[in-house]
Protein backbone atom coordinates (compact mmCIF):
# COMPACT_ATOMS: atom_id res chain seq x y z
CA UNK A 1 0.00 0.00 0.00
CA UNK A 2 2.81 2.37 0.94
CA UNK A 3 4.57 1.68 -2.36
CA UNK A 4 1.43 2.47 -4.36
CA UNK A 5 1.00 5.66 -2.35
CA UNK A 6 4.60 6.72 -2.97
CA UNK A 7 4.21 6.04 -6.71
CA UNK A 8 0.98 8.07 -6.77
CA UNK A 9 2.71 10.96 -5.04
CA UNK A 10 5.63 10.64 -7.46
CA UNK A 11 3.26 10.75 -10.43
CA UNK A 12 1.56 13.85 -9.05
CA UNK A 13 4.92 15.54 -8.52
CA UNK A 14 5.91 14.64 -12.09
CA UNK A 15 2.68 16.05 -13.49
CA UNK A 16 2.95 19.27 -11.52
CA UNK A 17 6.61 19.69 -12.45
CA UNK A 18 5.85 19.30 -16.14
CA UNK A 19 3.12 21.93 -15.87
CA UNK A 20 5.17 24.35 -13.81
CA UNK A 21 8.58 23.82 -15.47
CA UNK A 22 8.13 22.07 -18.81
CA UNK A 23 11.64 22.97 -19.94
CA UNK A 24 13.33 21.00 -17.17
CA UNK A 25 15.61 18.10 -18.10
CA UNK A 26 14.66 15.07 -16.04
CA UNK A 27 16.09 11.61 -15.31
CA UNK A 28 13.29 9.93 -13.36
CA UNK A 29 14.34 6.85 -11.38
CA UNK A 30 10.79 6.23 -10.20
CA UNK A 31 9.70 5.40 -13.74
CA UNK A 32 11.71 2.21 -13.24
CA UNK A 33 9.86 1.64 -9.95
CA UNK A 34 6.53 1.78 -11.73
CA UNK A 35 7.50 -0.78 -14.37
CA UNK A 36 9.97 -3.21 -12.78
CA UNK A 37 9.95 -5.18 -9.53
CA UNK A 38 13.75 -5.02 -9.55
CA UNK A 39 15.99 -2.45 -11.24
CA UNK A 40 18.33 -5.21 -12.42
CA UNK A 41 17.35 -7.77 -15.04
CA UNK A 42 18.45 -11.41 -15.01
CA UNK A 43 21.04 -10.53 -17.65
CA UNK A 44 22.65 -8.07 -15.25
CA UNK A 45 21.46 -4.99 -17.12
CA UNK A 46 20.03 -2.19 -15.00
CA UNK A 47 16.65 -1.26 -16.45
CA UNK A 48 17.47 2.46 -16.74
CA UNK A 49 19.37 1.47 -19.89
CA UNK A 50 16.06 0.57 -21.56
CA UNK A 51 15.15 4.26 -21.82
CA UNK A 52 18.59 5.90 -21.71
CA UNK A 53 20.14 4.27 -24.76
CA UNK A 54 23.50 6.04 -24.91
CA UNK A 55 26.32 4.51 -22.87
CA UNK A 56 28.33 6.84 -20.66
CA UNK A 57 30.93 6.37 -17.96
CA UNK A 58 29.80 5.78 -14.38
CA UNK A 59 32.27 5.15 -11.56
CA UNK A 60 31.81 3.79 -8.04
CA UNK A 61 34.08 4.06 -5.03
CA UNK A 62 33.43 1.79 -2.05
CA UNK A 63 35.64 0.64 0.83
CA UNK A 64 37.40 -2.67 0.34
CA UNK A 65 35.96 -3.95 3.63
CA UNK A 66 33.77 -2.78 6.50
CA UNK A 67 33.07 -4.00 10.02
CA UNK A 68 29.56 -4.95 11.21
CA UNK A 69 27.17 -2.17 12.25
CA UNK A 70 29.44 0.48 10.77
CA UNK A 71 28.51 3.66 8.91
CA UNK A 72 30.52 4.19 5.72
CA UNK A 73 30.10 5.93 2.37
CA UNK A 74 29.87 4.81 -1.23
CA UNK A 75 30.46 7.36 -3.96
CA UNK A 76 28.86 7.32 -7.42
CA UNK A 77 30.54 9.54 -10.00
CA UNK A 78 28.49 10.66 -13.02
CA UNK A 79 30.92 12.77 -15.06
CA UNK A 80 30.08 14.92 -18.06
CA UNK A 81 31.42 18.07 -19.68
CA UNK A 82 30.85 21.08 -17.46
CA UNK A 83 28.27 23.54 -18.78
CA UNK A 84 26.76 20.98 -21.16
CA UNK A 85 23.14 21.63 -22.17
CA UNK A 86 20.52 19.35 -23.71
CA UNK A 87 17.10 19.61 -25.32
CA UNK A 88 14.26 20.03 -22.82
CA UNK A 89 10.72 18.74 -23.29
CA UNK A 90 9.71 22.06 -24.87
CA UNK A 91 12.71 22.15 -27.20
CA UNK A 92 14.70 24.71 -25.23
CA UNK A 93 18.26 24.26 -23.99
CA UNK A 94 18.41 23.14 -20.36
CA UNK A 95 20.99 21.85 -17.92
CA UNK A 96 21.35 18.14 -17.34
CA UNK A 97 19.84 16.38 -14.36
CA UNK A 98 21.46 13.27 -12.89
CA UNK A 99 20.18 10.18 -11.12
CA UNK A 100 21.75 7.15 -9.48
CA UNK A 101 20.76 3.70 -8.26
CA UNK A 102 22.78 1.60 -5.81
CA UNK A 103 21.87 -2.05 -5.26
CA UNK A 104 23.43 -3.10 -1.97
CA UNK A 105 23.81 -6.65 -0.62
CA UNK A 106 20.97 -7.84 1.60
CA UNK A 107 21.20 -6.30 5.04
CA UNK A 108 23.06 -3.17 3.93
CA UNK A 109 20.88 -0.06 4.12
CA UNK A 110 20.94 3.72 4.11
CA UNK A 111 22.49 4.84 7.40
CA UNK A 112 20.16 6.56 9.89
CA UNK A 113 20.71 10.31 9.77
CA UNK A 114 21.50 10.48 13.49
CA UNK A 115 24.64 8.44 12.72
CA UNK A 116 25.84 10.63 9.86
CA UNK A 117 29.03 12.59 10.45
CA UNK A 118 29.18 16.31 9.76
CA UNK A 119 31.20 15.56 6.64
CA UNK A 120 28.48 13.20 5.38
CA UNK A 121 25.84 15.88 5.97
CA UNK A 122 27.83 18.38 3.93
CA UNK A 123 28.47 15.90 1.11
CA UNK A 124 24.77 14.99 0.83
CA UNK A 125 23.31 18.48 1.06
CA UNK A 126 20.48 18.84 -1.46
CA UNK A 127 20.31 15.08 -2.08
CA UNK A 128 17.19 13.03 -1.26
CA UNK A 129 17.52 9.26 -0.90
CA UNK A 130 14.63 6.83 -1.40
CA UNK A 131 14.16 3.06 -1.33
CA UNK A 132 13.24 1.26 -4.52
CA UNK A 133 10.35 -0.33 -2.61
CA UNK A 134 9.26 -0.88 0.98
CA UNK A 135 10.53 -4.45 1.00
CA UNK A 136 13.87 -3.58 -0.66
CA UNK A 137 15.68 -1.19 1.73
CA UNK A 138 18.99 -2.29 0.21
CA UNK A 139 18.17 -0.67 -3.16
CA UNK A 140 18.57 3.10 -3.04
CA UNK A 141 17.66 5.80 -5.56
CA UNK A 142 18.72 9.41 -6.00
CA UNK A 143 17.42 11.94 -8.50
CA UNK A 144 16.63 13.80 -10.47
CA UNK A 145 19.00 16.44 -9.08
CA UNK A 146 20.98 19.19 -10.85
CA UNK A 147 24.01 17.65 -12.50
CA UNK A 148 26.14 20.79 -12.34
CA UNK A 149 26.09 20.46 -8.54
CA UNK A 150 26.07 16.69 -8.15
CA UNK A 151 28.40 14.92 -10.59
CA UNK A 152 29.38 12.89 -7.55
CA UNK A 153 26.68 11.44 -5.29
CA UNK A 154 27.68 10.19 -1.84
CA UNK A 155 25.57 7.49 -0.17
CA UNK A 156 25.92 7.17 3.66
CA UNK A 157 25.45 3.45 4.30
CA UNK A 158 25.13 1.10 7.26
CA UNK A 159 26.60 -2.40 7.28
CA UNK A 160 24.61 -5.26 8.86
CA UNK A 161 25.62 -7.20 11.97
CA UNK A 162 25.58 -11.02 11.78
CA UNK A 163 25.41 -11.08 15.58
CA UNK A 164 21.88 -9.64 15.45
CA UNK A 165 20.71 -11.11 12.12
CA UNK A 166 21.25 -14.82 11.46
CA UNK A 167 20.61 -14.32 7.73
CA UNK A 168 23.75 -12.20 7.39
CA UNK A 169 27.17 -13.79 7.04
CA UNK A 170 30.70 -12.47 6.88
CA UNK A 171 32.28 -12.54 3.45
CA UNK A 172 32.56 -10.82 0.07
CA UNK A 173 29.50 -9.21 -1.55
CA UNK A 174 28.71 -7.43 -4.79
CA UNK A 175 27.17 -4.00 -5.30
CA UNK A 176 25.50 -2.94 -8.55
CA UNK A 177 25.62 0.76 -9.38
CA UNK A 178 23.99 2.79 -12.14
CA UNK A 179 24.38 6.46 -12.97
CA UNK A 180 22.52 8.59 -15.49
CA UNK A 181 22.86 12.06 -16.84
CA UNK A 182 20.22 13.73 -18.99
CA UNK A 183 16.88 12.68 -20.42
CA UNK A 184 16.04 9.36 -21.98
CA UNK A 185 15.38 8.60 -25.63
CA UNK A 186 12.42 6.32 -24.99
CA UNK A 187 9.55 6.63 -22.52
CA UNK A 188 8.46 3.56 -20.51
CA UNK A 189 5.44 3.38 -22.85
CA UNK A 190 7.81 2.73 -25.76
CA UNK A 191 7.31 6.13 -27.38
CA UNK A 192 10.31 8.20 -28.41
CA UNK A 193 11.08 11.41 -26.56
CA UNK A 194 12.22 14.54 -28.36
CA UNK A 195 15.75 13.67 -27.21
CA UNK A 196 16.24 11.00 -29.86
CA UNK A 197 17.05 10.50 -33.54
CA UNK A 198 13.98 10.21 -35.78
CA UNK A 199 14.29 7.96 -38.83
CA UNK A 200 12.36 7.43 -42.04
CA UNK A 201 9.51 4.93 -41.62
CA UNK A 202 9.71 3.99 -45.31
CA UNK A 203 11.77 4.55 -48.45
CA UNK A 204 10.62 7.25 -50.82
CA UNK A 205 10.66 10.96 -51.56
CA UNK A 206 9.99 13.72 -49.01
CA UNK A 207 6.79 15.25 -50.38
CA UNK A 208 5.99 17.78 -47.66
CA UNK A 209 7.13 19.20 -44.33
CA UNK A 210 4.35 20.93 -42.41
CA UNK A 211 4.12 22.60 -39.02
CA UNK A 212 2.35 20.57 -36.36
CA UNK A 213 1.22 21.22 -32.79
CA UNK A 214 3.59 22.53 -30.12
CA UNK A 215 6.41 23.23 -32.54
CA UNK A 216 6.46 19.77 -34.11
CA UNK A 217 6.94 19.02 -37.81
CA UNK A 218 4.89 16.58 -39.88
CA UNK A 219 6.95 15.01 -42.63
CA UNK A 220 5.25 13.18 -45.53
CA UNK A 221 7.10 10.56 -47.58
CA UNK A 222 5.69 9.29 -50.88
CA UNK A 223 6.72 5.69 -51.46
CA UNK A 224 7.35 3.98 -54.81
CA UNK A 225 3.94 2.29 -54.72
CA UNK A 226 2.16 5.64 -54.33
CA UNK A 227 1.45 5.46 -50.60
CA UNK A 228 1.92 8.51 -48.38
CA UNK A 229 3.62 7.82 -45.03
CA UNK A 230 3.85 10.49 -42.34
CA UNK A 231 6.28 10.92 -39.46
CA UNK A 232 5.71 13.48 -36.69
CA UNK A 233 8.91 14.96 -35.35
CA UNK A 234 8.57 16.85 -32.04
CA UNK A 235 10.22 20.15 -31.27
CA UNK A 236 13.91 19.79 -30.50
CA UNK A 237 15.66 17.55 -33.05
CA UNK A 238 16.87 19.39 -36.16
CA UNK A 239 15.66 18.19 -39.56
CA UNK A 240 18.36 16.94 -41.92
CA UNK A 241 16.13 16.56 -44.99
CA UNK A 242 14.22 18.89 -47.29
CA UNK A 243 11.24 18.52 -49.58
CA UNK A 244 12.27 16.55 -52.67
CA UNK A 245 14.99 14.52 -50.95
CA UNK A 246 14.99 10.77 -51.42
CA UNK A 247 15.37 8.73 -48.22
CA UNK A 248 15.82 5.08 -47.39
CA UNK A 249 13.82 3.32 -44.70
CA UNK A 250 15.64 3.74 -41.39
CA UNK A 251 17.71 6.69 -42.58
CA UNK A 252 18.07 9.58 -40.12
CA UNK A 253 15.63 12.42 -40.66
CA UNK A 254 17.06 14.45 -37.76
CA UNK A 255 20.28 14.97 -35.90
CA UNK A 256 20.92 13.22 -32.59
CA UNK A 257 20.20 15.83 -29.89
CA UNK A 258 21.15 13.57 -27.00
CA UNK A 259 24.24 14.51 -24.99
CA UNK A 260 23.58 12.36 -21.92
CA UNK A 261 23.61 8.67 -21.21
CA UNK A 262 23.61 5.86 -18.68
CA UNK A 263 26.36 3.68 -17.29
CA UNK A 264 26.59 0.88 -14.77
CA UNK A 265 29.40 -0.75 -12.83
CA UNK A 266 29.80 -3.53 -10.27
CA UNK A 267 31.88 -3.29 -7.12
CA UNK A 268 32.82 -5.61 -4.27
CA UNK A 269 32.87 -5.13 -0.52
CA UNK A 270 33.85 -7.47 2.29
CA UNK A 271 31.87 -7.66 5.52
CA UNK A 272 34.82 -8.29 7.77
CA UNK A 273 34.70 -10.41 10.92
CA UNK A 274 36.40 -8.37 13.67
CA UNK A 275 37.57 -11.59 15.35
CA UNK A 276 39.62 -12.39 12.25
CA UNK A 277 41.15 -8.92 12.39
CA UNK A 278 42.08 -9.38 16.04
CA UNK A 279 43.55 -12.79 15.19
CA UNK A 280 45.51 -11.27 12.30
CA UNK A 281 46.85 -8.53 14.57
CA UNK A 282 47.83 -11.14 17.15
CA UNK A 283 49.62 -13.13 14.43
CA UNK A 284 51.54 -10.05 13.27
CA UNK A 285 52.45 -9.27 16.89
CA UNK A 286 53.69 -12.84 17.40
CA UNK A 287 55.78 -12.67 14.22
CA UNK A 288 57.26 -9.34 15.26
CA UNK A 289 58.02 -10.67 18.75
CA UNK A 290 59.66 -13.79 17.29
CA UNK A 291 61.86 -11.63 15.05
CA UNK A 292 62.89 -9.49 18.01
CA UNK A 293 63.73 -12.59 20.06
CA UNK A 294 65.83 -13.99 17.19
CA UNK A 295 67.77 -10.74 16.92
CA UNK A 296 68.36 -10.68 20.68
CA UNK A 297 69.43 -14.33 20.66
CA UNK A 298 71.82 -13.69 17.77
CA UNK A 299 73.41 -10.78 19.61
CA UNK A 300 73.70 -12.90 22.74
CA UNK A 301 75.53 -15.62 20.80
CA UNK A 302 77.83 -13.04 19.21
CA UNK A 303 78.72 -11.68 22.66
CA UNK A 304 79.50 -15.17 23.96
CA UNK A 305 81.65 -15.92 20.91
CA UNK A 306 83.47 -12.63 21.31
CA UNK A 307 84.15 -13.37 24.98
CA UNK A 308 85.61 -16.79 24.13
CA UNK A 309 87.74 -15.29 21.36
CA UNK A 310 86.04 -17.53 18.79
CA UNK A 311 85.45 -15.21 15.84
From Swiss-Prot:
Q: How is the cofactor bound?
A: Binds 1 heme group covalently.
Q: What GO terms are given for molecular function?
A: electron transfer activity; heme binding; iron ion binding
A Pfam family annotated for this UniProt entry: Apocytochr_F_C
Query: Membrane-spanning residues where?
Result: 277-297
Q: Which cofactor does it need?
A: heme
Q: Which UniProt keywords apply?
A: Electron transport, Heme, Iron, Membrane, Metal-binding, Photosynthesis, Signal, Thylakoid, Transmembrane, Transmembrane helix, Transport
Membrane topology recorded in Swiss-Prot or TrEMBL? Single-pass membrane protein
Q: Where does heme bind?
A: 28, 48, 51-52
**Main localisation:** membrane
Q: Which NCBIfam families match?
A: PRK02693.1
Q: What does this protein do?
A: Component of the cytochrome b6-f complex, which mediates electron transfer between photosystem II (PSII) and photosystem I (PSI), cyclic electron flow around PSI, and state transitions.
Q: What is this protein called?
A: Cytochrome f
- Which species is this record about? Parasynechococcus marenigrum (strain WH8102)
Amino acid sequence: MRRHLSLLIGSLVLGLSLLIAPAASWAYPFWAQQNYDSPREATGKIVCANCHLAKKLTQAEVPQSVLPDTVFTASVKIPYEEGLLEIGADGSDVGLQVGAVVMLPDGFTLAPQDRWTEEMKEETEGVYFSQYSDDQPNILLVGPIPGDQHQEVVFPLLSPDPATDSNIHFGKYQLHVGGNRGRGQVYPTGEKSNNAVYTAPASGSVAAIEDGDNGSSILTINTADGAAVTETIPVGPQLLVNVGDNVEAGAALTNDPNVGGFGQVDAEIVLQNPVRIYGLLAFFAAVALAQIMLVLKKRQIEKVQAAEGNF
